[in-house]
Every structure is written in structure tokens, then in C-alpha cells.
């Protein structure tokens, strides 16, 4: 299968191709797709192949590649996440395969749009010039630049799919590399040092369980309670919540959200938005809205609190269940002592609600935005599977909640400084055990916004930039602990990460977005 020659050596003498060739030459040549060469394709196809190559080259040169999904090797207009990759080995009829391809294309469309928006002005202008020089038959004539780029991407995909064997190739190539560096593990003698890390993890797990076992009234407190409540309506209709969730679970589209009313999804997020009770002892305990400062680094504005949200999915018990992910951001984790390896700029708490078929909570879990400190809080609907006889990390179950109704909210008790989760309490009110004559509580509200907004943040100069680099990390949030944990294979342990890049086990391999994660550790509890 021939690739597209470098445009510096051959190109039709047309206005469109000249503009496209200029864009490619500036950024460098790119490998072409599977579907043929400029000499044996219609001009519109050739122009689109070159446009996509030019855009990819400009994105790479500018360092604005979105790292939340993986490219499907050999198919430049498809991307894949762990959920969609989990279907690749399963039988698919033509309709199912078409839906799956459409979902892969949707991931690329989303990421490509972010990358195009985040290009530096000069690079973006080169692509815009090339787009506007496209002939009408390239697709989406008269539409905006994004729409014309997408039309070309669809045309390139059609060429790739027409190649014999493309279906089998796509299914074998639709994989997501894990976020563990095997070379680092080899250099760090992980087969030996892993036992030391495992011993440390067991100590952490024991201490964490002991902390959760403390009576509420005895929880350590360094400051005053800051109760942070969602600004959205607080009395969701359980029947409506159940209907919305059931509609999502019952859909077999890739992804199911494609058939969901966005307003209904917003209602789900509003219904399950938690209340936070934060032990506030310093400015570091004041959450807020993430923005890019004048120095280009991530900062938090405490004047207005925005919790970022994401709709995710897990495959459990024969169903695809919706997951509501909320992230609360703090300006920093201050050092508890000189040289604290866990301290650093930007901090947070990620809270995930997995809904059952009827829309009621099935299990909660939480991580730090770096992927560390993964904890599970199942409801009584689930029972933990017996732990495997291995040194690898299992599910750290810190608390079990009673059965909860659809729309039930919870209150999260958050520690000062570390911002660790200390307790999960059904309801929205600060419990009596945490109150008293010497206890004051400030009450404020927060709004929610999709976490995709963090991939396109105003940069202060009229453009936008992703909070996350092409490696999926937030620059400037590195922690000294990375020099301790590098032999585990996790790159820059402690640094904040983009969704899809959260490795959550130092010993073993585990990712927060694994589609069978809940099934790996839990089974349905026996009914009484």
C-alpha cells in the first residue's frame, strides 16, 4: 500500500494544493493513509489527505497534541479510548461495526477540534488558508473551518475503510497503551523493588482503613469547616433520575451518550453533585476554578468554585453503566514538613459515582488527580471479591454505604492540607458529630462545568491552550515523589493528569478508566 509522497516533491499545480503543500512544508512531511497516492485518486481526495497530514504535522510541531485518547495506527482520523478498545475483540455485525467506527471517529473529531483551536496563531492561519482554498467538492462547502476539516477527515476515513482487510486491521490496532514505562521498571529492578513498594502500600492501606474507622466526632480538624454545596436544584425526582439512567443503560450505541438528551445528562450531574465539608485551615484549602496564570502555569481562582465533570462508562454485569465524575481543584498541597515529597502546585479530589440500571448509586470511588490514593466506597448492592493472593494492589475498600435511592446525594469530608477524603456521609447536611459550640462552618456554593473546558483554556493573549501537555501531564505540578516512585513505571508520579492517563496502582497495573474495573473487584451482593 503506497503512502502519500512528501508534498515538497510532488503536488498538483492548483491553488488548493499549493496552500496545503505550504502548510505541510512548514511543519514537515507526514505519512499518508492507506487509500492510495495523489496520482490515482480524485483531486478532492488528494487535497483532503494532504490537509489532514498538514494539520497533524502542525499539531505535532506546536506540541498541542491532545493526549486523552490514542491514535489508531494506520488510520489517522480514528482515535480510541479504553472503553471502545474493550469491544475490539468482540464479534460485530456490519451495523455494530459501523457504530463502533463512528464512535472512534467521534473521539478523533473532538480531539482534532481541540488541537486545531489550540494551535499558535501562525500555524492556525496556515491551516485556515489551506482549508479555505479547498474546492467545493472536498465537502462541507460554505461551512466553517472546523466543519470542512471534519468533512475531509470523513473522506480520508472512507478511503482507508475501502482498503481490503481494513476492518481486521482496525480491530487489531484499536488499542490504548498503558501508562507504565516498562523500561523504567526494568532499570529500577521492579521485580525486586516492587516488594518494597508493596509493603509500603500495605501500611498506607492499613492506616487509611483505621482513619475511616474513627468515630466522626474524633476526626482530626485543623481549622473551620467550609461546607461547599452544589448551586443546582437539591431535590431531584427519583422517578425522573431512574428514567434517565435506564435510557442510558438501555442504549446500545457507541457511546450511549449519543442518544441521551444533554439536558438529561445535566440533570444527572445536578442530582448526584456531592456536598463537600472541607477542613479549611489555610488558603491552600480554598478550592476554586482552574485557569492559566500570567506565567502560563495552572492556578486556582478561589473567588468562584467550579467543579469539573465528565460522563464516563463502565461495563458491569452485562450492561454499560453511566459514571458521573466530579473533580474539585485546590491551589496546592502545602508541605506537612520540610522536604515533603507529596507537596506541590495544584491539588484536587476526583469523585466518581457509578449508577446501577435503575439510576441508583452502585459504587463510589475516588482518586487524586495524579491517579494516586484510589479508594472504593461500594453500596450494599455490591460485595467485594476475595483478594487475589498477590503482592499487586487490590481494591482498597474504605467504607460501605447502605442502599441509596436514585438521586441520593452524599457529603464528602475532606482533610486540610492533604485534601484526602476522610468520610462519606449520606445526605447533604454537616452531621451533628462534626458540629459543636466551638465549631464554625462557612457555607458557599459551586457550579459545574465539563472538564473538556480544561483542554481549551484562555491563555491571556487571545488564544487557548490545554491545561494538559502532549504527555497528558499538567506542567508545573510535578512532585518530589517522582524521584521515589520512578521504578514503578509511572511517569512523574504525583503530577496532575488528563482523563484517560490515570495509572492508579504502584504495584501491578491499573487505570482509573478501565471498562471492567468494577467487575474486576466486585460482585452483586446476595439479596437478604
For each feature predicted by the language model, list its residue ranges.
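N-terminal secretory signal peptides that target proteins for export/translocation
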Residues: 1-10
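Short N-terminal edge-element motif at the start of the domain
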Residues: 286-364
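Domain-length functional cores that host ligand/cofactor binding and catalytic or interaction surfaces
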Residues: 34-243, 345-347, 358-528
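Acidic, contiguous segments within the catalytic cores of piggyBac-derived transposases
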Residues: 13
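Bacterial signal peptide processing site
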Residues: 30-32
Amino acid at each position: 500500500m503506497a503512502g502519500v509522497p512528501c508534498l515538497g516533491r510532488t503536488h498538483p499545480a492548483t491553488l488548493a494544493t499549493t496552500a496545503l503543500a505550504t502548510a505541510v512544508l512548514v511543519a514537515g512531511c507526514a505519512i499518508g493513509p492507506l487509500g492510495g497516492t495523489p496520482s490515482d485518486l480524485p483531486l478532492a481526495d488528494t487535497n483532503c489527505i494532504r490537509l489532514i497530514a498538514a494539520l497533524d504535522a502542525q499539531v505535532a510541531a506546536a506540541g498541542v497534541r491532545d493526549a486523552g485518547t490514542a491514535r489508531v495506527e494506520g488510520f489517522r482520523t480514528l482515535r480510541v479510548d479504553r472503553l471502545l478498545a474493550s469491544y475490539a475483540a468482540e464479534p460485530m455485525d456490519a451495523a455494530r461495526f459501523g457504530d463502533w467506527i463512528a464512535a472512534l471517529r467521534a473521539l478523533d473529531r473532538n480531539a482534532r477540534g481541540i488541537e486545531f483551536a489550540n494551535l499558535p496563531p501562525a500555524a492556525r492561519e496556515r491551516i485556515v488558508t489551506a482549508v479555505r482554498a479547498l474546492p467545493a467538492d472536498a465537502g462541507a462547502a460554505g461551512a466553517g473551518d472546523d466543519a470542512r476539516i471534519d468533512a475531509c477527515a470523513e473522506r480520508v476515513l472512507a478511503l482507508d475503510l475501502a482498503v481490503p482487510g481494513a476492518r481486521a486491521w482496525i480491530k487489531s490496532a484499536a488499542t490504548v497503551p498503558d501508562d507504565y514505562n516498562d523500561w523504567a521498571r526494568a532499570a529500577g529492578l521492579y521485580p525486586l523493588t516492587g516488594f518494597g513498594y508493596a509493603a509500603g502500600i500495605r501500611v498506607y492501606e492499613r492506616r487509611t482503613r483505621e482513619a475511616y474507622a474513627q468515630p466522626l466526632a474524633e476526626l482530626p480538624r485543623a481549622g473551620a469547616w467550609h461546607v461547599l454545596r452544589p448551586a443546582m436544584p437539591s431535590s431531584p425526582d427519583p422517578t425522573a433520575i431512574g428514567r434517565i439512567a435506564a435510557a442510558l443503560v438501555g442504549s446500545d450505541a457507541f457511546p450511549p451518550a449519543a442518544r441521551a438528551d444533554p439536558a438529561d445528562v445535566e440533570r444527572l450531574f445536578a442530582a448526584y453533585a456531592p456536598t463537600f465539608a472541607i477542613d479549611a485551615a489555610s488558603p491552600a484549602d480554598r478550592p476554586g476554578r482552574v485557569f492559566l496564570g500570567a506565567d502560563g502555569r495552572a492556578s486556582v481562582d478561589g473567588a468562584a468554585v467550579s467543579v469539573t465533570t465528565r460522563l464516563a462508562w463502565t461495563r458491569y454485569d452485562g450492561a454499560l453503566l453511566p459514571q458521573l465524575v466530579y473533580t474539585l481543584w485546590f491551589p496546592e498541597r502545602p508541605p506537612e514538613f520540610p522536604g515533603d515529597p507529596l507537596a506541590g502546585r495544584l491539588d484536587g479530589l476526583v469523585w466518581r459515582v457509578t449508577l446501577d440500571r435503575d439510576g441508583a448509586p452502585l459504587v463510589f470511588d475516588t482518586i487524586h488527580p495524579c491517579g494516586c490514593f484510589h479508594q472504593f466506597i461500594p453500596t450494599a448492592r455490591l460485595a467485594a471479591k476475595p483478594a487475589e493472593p498477590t503482592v499487586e494492589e487490590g481494591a482498597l475498600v474504605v467504607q460501605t454505604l447502605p442502599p441509596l435511592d436514585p438521586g441520593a446525594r452524599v457529603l464528602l469530608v475532606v482533610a486540610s492540607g492533604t485534601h484526602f477524603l476522610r468520610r462519606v456521609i449520606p445526605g447533604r447536611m454537616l452531621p451533628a458529630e462534626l458540629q459543636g459550640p466551638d465549631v464554625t462552618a462557612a457555607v458557599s456554593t459551586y457550579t459545574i462545568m465539563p472538564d473538556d473546558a480544561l483542554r481549551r483554556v484562555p491563555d491571556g493573549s487571545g488564544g487557548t491552550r490545554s491545561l494538559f501537555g502532549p504527555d497528558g501531564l499538567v506542567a508545573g505540578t510535578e512532585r518530589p515523589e517522582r524521584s521515589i516512585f520512578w521504578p514503578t513505571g509511572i511517569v512523574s508520579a504525583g503530577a496532575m493528569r488528563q482523563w484517560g492517563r490515570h495509572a492508579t496502582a504502584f504495584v501491578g497495573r491499573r487505570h482509573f478508566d478501565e471498562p471492567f474495573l468494577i467487575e474486576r473487584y466486585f460482585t452483586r451482593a446476595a439479596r437478604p
